[in-house]
Curated annotation (Swiss-Prot):
Its cofactor is Zn(2+). Pathway: Amino-acid biosynthesis; L-histidine biosynthesis; L-histidine from 5-phospho-alpha-D-ribose 1-diphosphate: step 9/9. It is an enzyme of class 1 (oxidoreductase). SUPFAM superfamilies: ALDH-like (SSF53720). This is Histidinol dehydrogenase. The gene is hisD. InterPro entries: Ald_DH/histidinol_DH, Histidinol_DH_CS, Histidinol_DH_monofunct, Hstdl_DH. One of its GO terms (cellular component) is cytosol. Catalyzes the sequential NAD-dependent oxidations of L-histidinol to L-histidinaldehyde and then to L-histidine.
Length: 434
């Protein structure tokens, strides 16, 4: 089905509607699973030696030093323009402001007299950030990951990226307080972060995007007892736009294309109650597509994308919630009034002047978001992902005495005798003291 095909939602059967909201299949195979498993085992067993072999095999690079030196990072900084450095500084300031505001106050309550319960937060001690290489270095992801890690108070923050690492990534790492950067990419980088090598330290949690091999490696290490936790499940990028007749077609088209250019497996969807708006957006997409350097990539993504006409805006919201997009853009009159009805989305952009690009780079929200339907259960990345919650309880003699019979009754009902005894022994001790 061509992207230019305008679909009337209410003329479709329930099965057709379901098909319209299906996402492109994620490329997985037994061969990827086996290959990644072998890489993990090899790196775990042979450490740095295995990392160098994989760099030669996959990156066609001879790596003499796995650790990037301070001199290399300083030289990278010198090669960047002041304009780019200033732009990064503005982005970091906004990310800092938004994520600092996410700090949770401690909870400290008396659930009943003499029974004190608290909730406190502690940072994840060590985190590893993975940043892909390629022709378009994702240095903005360094800002999005390293900044909240620093605010959370993570003691160890390290970064891996395939060699040669772009100057922008090295500078962003320095700007955000990353302590060590390593010349290693792919599934082998995930293995190094999960298990540790002579050069790369083992970390508690791994963050960052990657290809099918990186994604599979993260999945596997998160399921190994000696592995590491990961940020969230990964999938192709996506955006859904809700637009009414007052939206600007060129703005809508540019937002759709900014997501489509990410990759051929990206998906973009327009929902509008105005058929004429759908037609005008399709025309604007074609005009803008012709000017894009990544036009072929975007065109492939558009082949699995949709222009859907609905009954009204309420139905747009209903369909959007059913789909649960990574990015949701609402370009309608009084866009904010629709927010309360949104139940599943990674990040929401309201009005004509809130392009997805703002959140991707510099508004302050995080661009690491759940995708592929995971918005039903997962949240956008935030400060909490770099922290742990811990509860504390303290019972006075009086508080314990008042609660003891309740605990004994519940423990006996579950036939957990030792649990009951732990209370009964204390009750008897109090009686002896009386």
């Amino acid at each position: 089905m061509s992207f230019n095909t305008i679909i009337d939602w209410n003329s479709c059967t329930a099965e057709q509607q379901r098909q319209l909201l299906m996402r492109p299949a994620i490329s997985t195979s037994e061969s990827i699973t086996r290959t990644v498993n072998d890489i993990l085992d090899n790196v775990k067993a042979r450490g740095d030696e295995a990392l160098r072999e994989y760099s030669a095999k996959f990156d066609k690079t001879t790596v003499t030093a796995l650790t990037v030196s301070a001199e290399e990072i300083a030289a990278a900084s010198e090669r960047l323009s002041d304009e780019l450095k200033q732009a990064m500084a503005v982005a970091v300031k906004n990310i800092e402001t938004f994520h600092t505001a996410q700090k949770l106050p401690p909870v400290d309550v008396e659930t009943q007299p003499g029974v004190r319960c608290q909730q406190v937060t502690r940072p994840v001690a060590s985190v590893g950030l993975y940043i892909p290489g390629g022709s378009a270095p994702l240095f903005s992801t360094v800002l999005m990951l390293a900044t909240p890690a620093r605010i959370a108070g993570c003691k160890k923050v390290v970064l891996c990226s395939p060699p040669p690492i772009a100057d922008e990534i090295l500078y962003a790492a320095q700007l955000c307080g990353v302590q060590d950067v390593f010349n290693v990419g792919g599934a082998q980088a995930i293995a190094a972060l999960a298990f540790g090598t002579e050069s790369v330290p083992k970390v508690d949690k791994i963050f960052g995007p990657g290809n099918a091999f990186v994604t599979e490696a993260k999945r596997q290490v998160s399921q190994r007892l000696d592995g590491a936790a990961i940020d969230m499940p990964a999938g192709p990028s996506e955006v859904l736009v809700i637009a009414d007749s007052g939206a600007t077609p060129d703005f809508v088209a540019s937002d759709l294309l900014s997501q489509a250019e990410h990759g051929p497996d990206s998906q973009v969807i327009l929902l509008t109650p105005a058929a004429d708006m759908a037609r005008r957006v399709a025309e604007a997409v074609e005009r803008q597509l012709a000017e894009l350097p990544r036009a072929e990539t975007a065109r492939q993504a558009l082949s699995a994308s949709r222009l859907i006409v609905t009954k009204d805006l309420a139905q747009c919201v209903e369909i959007s919630n059913q789909y649960g997009p990574e990015h949701l853009i609402i370009q309608t009159r009084n866009a904010r009034v629709l927010v309360d009805g949104i139940t599943s989305a990674g990040s929401v952009f309201l009005g004509d002047w809130s392009p997805e690009s703002a959140g991707d780079y510099a508004s302050g929200t995080n661009h690491v978001l759940p995708t592929y339907g995971y918005t039903a259960t997962c949240s956008s990345l935030g400060l909490a992902d770099f922290q742990k919650r811990m509860t504390v309880q303290e019972l006075s003699k009086e508080g314990f005495s008042a609660l003891a019979s309740t605990i004994e009754t519940l423990a006996a009902a579950e036939r957990l005798t030792a649990h009951k005894n732990a209370v009964t022994l204390r009750v008897n001790a109090l009686k002896e003291q009386a």
